[in-house]
Amino acid sequence: MQLPFYVEALASNPKLLMKQHGQHATLSLHAVHIQCSGFMDILDSILKNTDQTIGQAMQLGDRELQQLWKWNASVPQTLDDCIHDIFVEKARRDPSRQAVVSWDGELSYGEVDQFSTLLAIHLIKLGVKFGNHVLLCFEKSMWTVVAVLAVMKSGGTLVLTDPSQPEARLQTIATEVGANLMLTSERQEELGKRILAGGVIVVNHDFFQQIQTSVLPPASTTDLPSVPGSSPLYTIFTSGSTGKPKGVVISHANYTSGALPRAEAVGYGPHSRVLDFPSYAFDVSIDCMLCTLAHGGCVCVPSEDDRVNNLSGAIRNMKVNMAHMTPSVARVLGEDTLSSLEVLGLGGESVSVRDAANWGKLTKVIIAYGPSECTVGCTINNEIALDRAYTSIGKGVGGVTWVVDPTDHSRLMPIGAIGELIIEGPIVGRGYLNDPERTSSVFIEDPMWLLSGCQGYPGRHGRFYKTGDLVKYDPDSSGSIVFVGRGDQQVKLRGQRVELGEVEHHLRTRLPAGNVVAAEVITPGGKGDQPTLVAFIAEKTTTKSQTNKEIATFSTELRHSLEVMDKALGSVLPRYMVPSAYIPLLEMPLLVSCKVDRKKLRSLGSAMSRKELIRHKTFSSQKEPQSERERQLAHLWKCLFGAEAEIDVQSNFFDLGGDSLMAMKLVAAARAENLLTSVADIFRHPTLAELAITLKHSDSEAEIDVPPFSLLDSHWKENNARIETAKLCGIDATSVMDVYPCTTLQEGLMALSAKVSEAYVAQRVVELADFQTAQRLQRAFETAAADSPILRTRIVQVPGRGLMQVVLKDGITWRAGTTLEEYLVKDRNESMGLGTPLARFAITSNETTGKVHFVLTIHHALYDGWSMPLVVRRVNRAFNNQESERSVAFNSFIKHLSGLNHKDSEIYWKEQLQGANGLQFPALPRAGYQTQAQSLLEQYFPLGKTSASSTSIATSIRAAWALVAGKYTLSDDVVFGETLTGRNAPVVGIEKIEGPMITTVPVRVRFDRNARVSEYLRRIHDDSILRIPHEHMGLQHIRRLSPDAREACELRTGIVIHPTTTEDGKNLTGDGPANGFVPAGDEDAAREALKFNTYALMLVCSLDPKGFLVMASFDSATIDVCQMDKVLGQFGQTVQQLCENGNALVSDLLPMTDDELAEIWRFSNTYKPNSGNEVVLGHDYSHATATWIVAPEDSEQLVPLGGIGELVIEGDFPTNTSIQISGTKWLSAGHRDIPGRQATLHKTGQLAKYNSDGSLVILGGKGGNIKSDMEIKKPEAKSRSQVTTPKQQKLRKLWARVLGISEDEVGSNDSFFDLGGDSISAMKLVSEGRMENLELVVMQVFQHRRFHDMADIAKESLPLQVSTKQYSPFSTLDVSDVDTFISESIRPSLLNSSWKVVDVLPARPLQEIAVDGTINLPRYSARYELFYLDAAVDQSHLLKSCQELISRNEILRTIFVKSGGSCFGVVIEELQLPLDEYQIDGDLTAFAEQLCGLDIQTVMSLGSPFIKFFVVQSSSGLSCLIMRISHAQYDEICLPILLRQLSALYEGELVPAGLPFSSFVHHIVRNNIPQSIEYWRRLLQGSSMSVLRPSTPLISKKSIFISKTFDISSRSKEITLATLPTAAWALCLARRLSLRDVTFGEVVSGRNIDFANCDTVVGPTWQYIPVRVKFKSGWTVIDLLNFVQHQHISSTPFEGIGLKEIVRKCTDWPETTEWFDSVVHQDVEHVESLRFLSANSRMDTIYPHLEPLREWKIQAFPKGDSLCIEIVTFESWRAEADSILNEMGDIISLLVTKPNSTLFQTDVMEESTPPTS
């Protein structure tokens, strides 16, 4: 028998020989050694003294004691620094660095510092002193970080809470700490006020705008106290065994002493982007904020929704590289997400060996452990050994670890023995708040073994915390700790700390006395299920279970008590501490010690299945309704669903066939019985038992009238309201009966009517028997109007108050007509608008035919499809002389809307639509296209019974459309609009309100293709419930919340779901002639909705008991009729599958119909055996036999026609040409009469789609953006005037080459600019002309733009001769001794002193700025060019080409240094290619982008090369070449030169020549600047910089980019594109600043100077130069354009001088002027692809860091006949920017359409100047 350890004793008188044997397979060598040593020490002690006690003999031996002291000899130093001071220093050094990126905004270090200082000073003013507790109650938000630092700076003590915890618990915490102040968010404000009656501060932008004036000038750290390390930093509350949470107090010194070494062990640094995932109720959330900011990292804060539902997406979108979470959470993340992390920190629960091993292959795994009493983490394992059967929690960090006897802490345990972990050191907290007794029991001092020390280690004093955790030392001799388990009743459940005693306390206090209770965590069904908290209960008298001798049955009395208690627990305990089941026991199992046998309980629980547990959560043993409320509700349900419906307490409303319409009817029926419920309650609590509990009693006599004028602003008095609105209506004030605000729907409808007069106006005609009947109907309408205010309502725009509804005393004016046709035309031509009647009534009587018609013309702002039948019912009853009940007035609904918390809705929609900026379906044919639906299709789809029990057909429709649209946009994140009844609001009698309440909301559906259908439907269903309180915000208001919201609300598809009308609904209107004013049935009602379609595609789904009819109204320019027919088929089939396959995966659903699949096979099946036919698709796939389009993520799924997928090609190709697929099931199976086959498919990496005619459209590579599939037609050649002379022929060739047109398109009378020329092409023309011995200068191109004029002034010269005047290196320097200068000032600054210096140049001003933007963070001047190569390249040849590129271009061999306050470019003779190479297996694009993100964090210092190359080779054969370059080495004109040189070097072609930058700099410094001074001095004499400063405080310096595209097709081609935006901005500035003389900046190439071949200079020649416009009286638009264009032309020879030089030498501006206040940028040439032999290189450009904003940027991007203007400014100035952009559009329109308008008589200059805020 092999034993792991045994001792062999051999007697040898007088000695005893002992031999120890250990098996290395089970014990490490160190463990064997420890066992042996311990055994020998005890044996030796017994033999020496047989009189001692066993306890004395068990004392540790010297060798073991010395080992323990060796591990714990030094206690880490106490660090008295405060973390917020460390942060402040980081912010001071690098204020622009990103500190927080959050769903609700971004903050830099400077902004966090500024805001937290402002708030801290405010707190101090409110009386916060050292140690005062300040509560923080936030959902996940960037403002939490600010609030935390603010409290720290003020000296207060943080109390972080999680608002999702029960309010009673939060109230207990607030009372315990004695807080007088709470910092909170807008969303939690109401909760905060309930917890703390006063002192609640909402932290947001508005708050800082308010306090800034009271704190400034200026708020700084000098206004703040110096916080001592001994001051308490935070109090964190954990579970307490007495039922009350216990507060642990941690000081600044405690925290810092642990945080800094812990951060070092984990790997925090400036590159860290840390996920703020943990709940604020747990201290690890503090680490996520403070450790990150103390080390220069970025805190990444997801929304609460993303944190729970889209964690992987949040990690990906925020580029998180470090995350801390429990293993349970980590298990839900995919491998791609885990591998994107640099560090995965695990804690909160045990980490299995398997998880550690699996995750360790993907990322760096770190295991942390630490009770709250010792700050966040007291041990760290950052080197996890994967070859063991256990994991270690690591060694002490910030403290030392000891293991003691769990029952006696005065005795140390032997190494390897299990004992209690105790912590010593500066991280041990101060204790428990207000609980000295508990503190003294677990915070201990000076045990005797510590005071005694041991040989070689003197004793010491020390303070400890007893963790209660059982551990042992790692047998590997490292001193690490292995966690074994808890020694008390404290457990961890899914990372949450649960004190079982606290749970048991609340159970006992709520159950009858005498019941024995034990809470325990079990694992149902053994190891396979999730740990679950349950409660075991033994009654005094119980009934034995028939199936289990230990399990009992609860008595009826106890069941009732449990039911009451279970509901109550949720209000006092967090959700995770409420038991999931209550298990009845015959008796509680006990140990010999009479303690509960918890091991036995866990065994009992684990023997149960999850289903059995669920049964133990159901308390009622009877199914029949028991309570009065249940019986009342069951009766109501039977009335809705029929008497035959089987209803018990567990019946589900939706299982019985309920939907939103039925829910509204139930609300109304309940109200009739004086019971109150809401639609939202029905959705949240769908079972009868749950819903019955929510029912409330209502007072049937409750007043429901809203007094007239009571909904107005208190400052707008009734009399004033009457007078003002009456004037707007053109009536007497006495006729106004009420005034109240409009709904958002009415606002939108009136806005649309203002654009299109007939929009949303309906004409309804009823033919009547005779004129007498018409008169009766007329009287009936008058009677109805008296009781229905909506028929007497007009809408007016009240200045300063917005749109208002005006209810008149007499609202009906009657009209008459002779013939129906004439009246309808006349009526249609009369607009309905503001102040006019919105309902018109007429009777036409045709004497010739005898026909009588009644015409109702009504605006949709007065009715919707629900309310119109109610009005008609009222009219019919009046017609039949019947009384009508008094309805609830429309102003009741308005009152409800005015009482809503709009902040909640704003937060909801902002969070809901964050990131919803993807493609929408259908695509528009071009930018700015205005849709107009002109096509209609419909299909009917039968449905069986849904298997998704709690979801309605409406849910399946939403879900299906998301899946179908996702196929066409290649997205799993889809947005569409849905129009709802709007009657889910909790308004008494809402179902009877006569007025329009429909509302449209953006519906966002995100789906996981690997989720089950039932889960997918449940998520959509739940989303619809959450949306109910926010559905009336209105699209026009939602879109203003954020850029993402604005883009999401550009809805292309709208859906209306029209439910089945029940029999009582069909009879709603009663009998009478007015029935002709409403649709006859469900289908007619659905078609009515289509008349008001404003979408590219509108789907109206009309439901009936057997299925649904879908009608599509659409613009066939966005999707053709044939394709739309297929889309409807896919949609209907998907709805059917969702209803029938609840257990299937979403990915299993078939995306297309069988007929469509047959069509795809017909399109794709060009394969003919032995035919030799080939489909020629391009260079790479010349042997293709068939093409297919498959889902990019799953090649087993064909994409439907029109859907986007990856193009795969069938055929025989070399194996190295592509990724190959074989064995696809669909190809093997074939379809219908086409047999299947075995063939190899090749993935092209290209996205594609089929048109409806089978033609194939390539949309671009998978990694790039989808391109438009539209073609741009070239203009046809026109007849031209004769070009005869050799000089003309030479010039015509030059024009054709430069403009990219044929020579036939150039005529003698043509203008260079009419044919597409601009300033850049003018420069090229001059340069290329010089090469052809034709002399021109740029100014001449502008002045003589006609071909014949230009040919006349162009001079022919002799062939270029080599200049005898060569540039001399170092000649630009102003130094007397070049050698001394180099040796003393240059060479010491170089990274490599052996480099041979061949030239030194003074850096140009913009170069100097770019150098600073490269060496300092953020490195906004560093740019990465990525070349994705779609086939293997000769890597060694490619790298030789890169080396040659550097050798040919001195700018790439330029090293920048600073000396004497100046910056120099040092050209070295040779620079070895700076190169990093990588071999990867994963995603090439993701790795390349991540590599750029990492490289930008590395130091780029002066004296070292900025240029660098990277080669990434993928195992797939694809590769990526990356070039890093600084803006100090290139501009947008020379970069294409460099790239084309690289391509030519690789291809072995003629390399495009380039002039060295040194010769250009020499010319500028020696010639151009001296020549330019007089020009700029004359132009700028008496000028000043035009400064545009909005009055809005600059709270956020975050950049925003807003843009619009404007039509410039009417532009005169004589005016260049460069002139237009510059002139427009000059005019805009003049208006806004009320000036006639404006000066601003413009970006120019710097290459229009008189310097031969300047366009080929390889280096950054670009400049910022002034533009000055002095407006003159009498100027026309064309005068302005000509003036600006002339200034462009005249300044070109002088654009080499920099702004700094202009300011100093040419103006009297302050010398501190470093930048323009506003700058106009022009778009330049971009290279999108290069070829490397057979490899086609797709290019991408990455700027990892954004440039800090210094000015207003106005950027112009010409696109054919349109001009896109983009404004870049600060987020705080968004409103001003929006206004400016609109104004720029108006001005551009003026400039291109009214050239002869006089400026000072137009609205441009003479109207009131807009304010600057």
Swiss-Prot record:
Listed GO CC annotations: cytoplasm
Gene Ontology biological-process entries: amino acid activation for nonribosomal peptide biosynthetic process; secondary metabolite biosynthetic process
EC top class named in words: ligase
Induction conditions: Expression is induced during iron deprivation. Also induced in response to reactive nitrogen species.
Record-listed O-(pantetheine 4'-phosphoryl)serine modification sites: S660, S1319
Region span, Condensation 2: 1427-1806
Pfam family of the protein (one): PP-binding
Domain Carrier stretches: 624-699, 1282-1358
Keywords on record: Ligase, Multifunctional enzyme, Phosphopantetheine, Phosphoprotein, Repeat
Protein's pathway: Siderophore biosynthesis
EC number(s) recorded for this UniProt protein: 6.3.2.-
Region (Condensation 1): 738-1159
Region (Adenylation): 89-494
Record-level Gene Ontology MF annotations: ligase activity; phosphopantetheine binding
CDD domains: A_NRPS_SidN3_like (cd05918), CT_NRPS-like (cd19542), FUM14_C_NRPS-like (cd19545)
Keyword Endoplasmic reticulum in annotation: no
Protein family according to the UniProt entry: Belongs to the NRP synthetase family.
Function as written in the Swiss-Prot or TrEMBL entry: Nonribosomal peptide synthetase; part of the gene cluster that mediates the biosynthesis of hydroxamate-containing siderophores that play a critical role in virulence via intracellular iron acquisition during macrophage infection.
UniProt comment concerning the protein's domains: NRP synthetases are composed of discrete domains (adenylation (A), thiolation (T) or peptidyl carrier protein (PCP) and condensation (C) domains) which when grouped together are referred to as a single module. Each module is responsible for the recognition (via the A domain) and incorporation of a single amino acid into the growing peptide product. Thus, an NRP synthetase is generally composed of one or more modules and can terminate in a thioesterase domain (TE) that releases the newly synthesized peptide from the enzyme.
Entries under PANTHER family matching the protein: FATTY ACID SYNTHASE, NONRIBOSOMAL PEPTIDE SYNTHETASE
Protein name as annotated: Nonribosomal peptide synthetase 1
Source organism phylogeny: Eukaryota, Fungi, Dikarya, Ascomycota, Pezizomycotina
